[in-house]
Amino acid sequence: MKFTPSIVIDAPQYYVDHFNGKYNVDKCVILRDLQLETDSESMPSSLKHLTKPTHILDLTNNDLIMIPDLSRRDDIHTLLLGRNNIVEVDGRLLPMNVQNLTLSNNSIRRFEDLQRLRRAPRTLKNLTLIGNQVCHLANYREHVLRLVPHLETLDFQNVTAEERKSAMSFPRQADGDTLGPVNTAIRDNGSRDKTMEIMNLVVSKMTVERRNELKKQLAEATSLEEIARLEKLLSGGV
């Protein structure tokens, strides 16, 4: 489904207080579960209608293949893009004051797909990439921290001083990529298809009642950790 102005304008909105503990401060706009697709024409023009301020933008479980261009937005501090088909992360497209970015369960497979993450705003503190094949590559955390040294948490784990030191000591290749052995099994082109096959099998066996229960819990989730846990269950737990 393509983005349209009406979809953006009519998107459900609610306020949350779990980011700073203050009641009715952070406005969350919900554009999840709509099968929205990346489109170079309709997506940018439609997102211009996104209400302002929007502090949390939820685009979870759509068909996006790239991050939408939100670089002109100074109000969005949390961007939820889990369970899409994003293959490359371009930090230049992120909101200028983004602090929290969730990209769990996408199609990010190689370190090369993360290179433009180095252009992310320095405000980015919390990044989630769980469920992407790139997470299984050797020296994954060090590589990400080399690209985004100002991160405080990666995949819900605090970044340690030792990790920062290790990341900075990594040698670089001529093209700017950090060196490190790669798990060749992960690079197999068929591995993604196999993962999706398993995921579909697990989800198909889940009862409607169970799925509805998980969706209700997801709507009431009060932390990024809880959201990620429930999203993983809904996607089959793989």
UniProtKB/Swiss-Prot annotation:
A Pfam family (short name) is LRR_9
Gene3D superfamilies tied to this protein: Ribonuclease Inhibitor (3.80.10.10)
The answer, when asked if Nucleus is one of the entry's keywords, is: yes
Keyword Nucleus found: yes
Keyword annotations from UniProtKB, A to Z? Leucine-rich repeat, mRNA processing, mRNA splicing, Nucleus, Repeat, Spliceosome
Residue ranges of the LRR repeats are: 53-74, 75-95, 97-118
Q: Where is the signal peptide?
A: none
Q: Which InterPro entries match?
A: Leu-rich_rpt, LRR_dom_sf, RU2A, U2A'_phosphoprotein32A_C
Give one GO molecular function term. U2 snRNA binding
One GO biological-process annotation of the entry reads:
mRNA splicing, via spliceosome
Taking every annotated instance into account, which residue ranges of this chain make up the domain LRRCT? 132-170
- Show the segment(s) annotated as Disordered: 167-189
Q: Name one GO cellular component term.
A: nucleus
Q: What family name appears in the similarity comment? A: Belongs to the U2 small nuclear ribonucleoprotein A family.
Its subunit composition reads: Belongs to the CWC complex (or CEF1-associated complex), a spliceosome sub-complex reminiscent of a late-stage spliceosome composed of the U2, U5 and U6 snRNAs and at least BUD13, BUD31, BRR2, CDC40, CEF1, CLF1, CUS1, CWC2, CWC15, CWC21, CWC22, CWC23, CWC24, CWC25, CWC27, ECM2, HSH155, IST3, ISY1, LEA1, MSL1, NTC20, PRP8, PRP9, PRP11, PRP19, PRP21, PRP22, PRP45, PRP46, SLU7, SMB1, SMD1, SMD2, SMD3, SMX2, SMX3, SNT309, SNU114, SPP2, SYF1, SYF2, RSE1 and YJU2. Interacts with MSL1.
Also noted in the record is:
Present with 3630 molecules/cell in log phase SD medium.
Q: What does this protein do?
A: Involved in pre-mRNA splicing. Associates to U2 snRNA in a MSL1 dependent manner and is required for normal accumulation of U2 snRNA. Required for the spliceosome assembly and the efficient addition of U2 snRNP onto the pre-mRNA.
Q: What is this protein called?
A: U2 small nuclear ribonucleoprotein A'
Which organism does this sequence originate in? Saccharomyces cerevisiae (strain ATCC 204508 / S288c) (Baker's yeast)
Name the gene for this chain: LEA1
